[in-house]
């Protein structure tokens, strides 16, 4: 892809939009641990069931990594991240409305698929839109945002 360097103000805005998506990705990744007492009570889940819910997220996430590279190269990060976050929203709403373990599991897989672009999409965008000297800093800040998402996921 050809570089198309953005002005600094636009680059900062783009970073914050991407960072919000990555924060939500981290939050959704870890939230089953926070919700485990409620899920165990409400759905009569075992520890194995909770593990499957956590694994469902990673199954969806991992299954998209190879197609994601192709899609990012073909359509660009803006379109792909938007489309994938829509899938994550659908999965999150489905999780909130689920009436059974299978509904929860399918929702977690959808969430994993939906947030699978929240790291590689921004990294691709930074490569295209940011000056070379800002890319490493943006990547480091993204990892900090991930950590913040994990911390915030511990709050009820």
Where are these regions (language model features)?
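Cytoplasmic helix-loop-helix junction between adjacent transmembrane helices
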Residues: 107-145
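Conserved MFS/SLC helix-loop-helix module at the cytosolic interface between two early adjacent transmembrane helices
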Residues: 63-99
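Extracellular/periplasmic helix-loop-helix junction of adjacent transmembrane segments
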Residues: 35-62
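Small-residue-rich transmembrane alpha-helices and their cytosolic helix-loop interfaces
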Residues: 22, 54, 58, 85, ...
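Residue-level signature of mid-helix packing/kink "hotspots" within the transmembrane helices
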Residues: 30, 58-66, 150-151
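Small-residue-rich segments within alpha-helical transmembrane domains of MFS-like 12-TM solute carriers
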Residues: 26, 30, 112-120, 151
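Paired small-residue
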Residues: 91, 102-110
């Amino acid at each position: 892809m050809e570089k198309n360097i953005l002005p600094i103000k636009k680059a900062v805005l783009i970073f914050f939009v991407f960072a919000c998506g990555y924060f939500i990705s981290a939050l959704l990744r870890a939230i089953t641990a926070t919700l485990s007492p409620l899920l165990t009570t409400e759905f009569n889940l075992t520890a194995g069931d909770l593990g499957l819910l956590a694994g469902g997220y990673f199954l969806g996430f991992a299954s998209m990594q190879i197609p994601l590279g192709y899609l990012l190269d073909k359509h660009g990060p803006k379109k792909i991240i938007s489309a994938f976050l829509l899938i994550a929203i659908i999965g999150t709403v489905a999780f909130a409305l689920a009436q059974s373990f299978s509904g929860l599991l399918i929702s977690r897989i959808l969430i994993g698929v939906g947030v699978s672009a929240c790291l590689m999409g921004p990294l691709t965008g930074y490569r295209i839109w940011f000056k070379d000297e800002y890319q490493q800093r943006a990547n480091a800040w993204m990892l900090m945002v991930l950590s913040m998402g994990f911390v915030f996921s511990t709050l009820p």
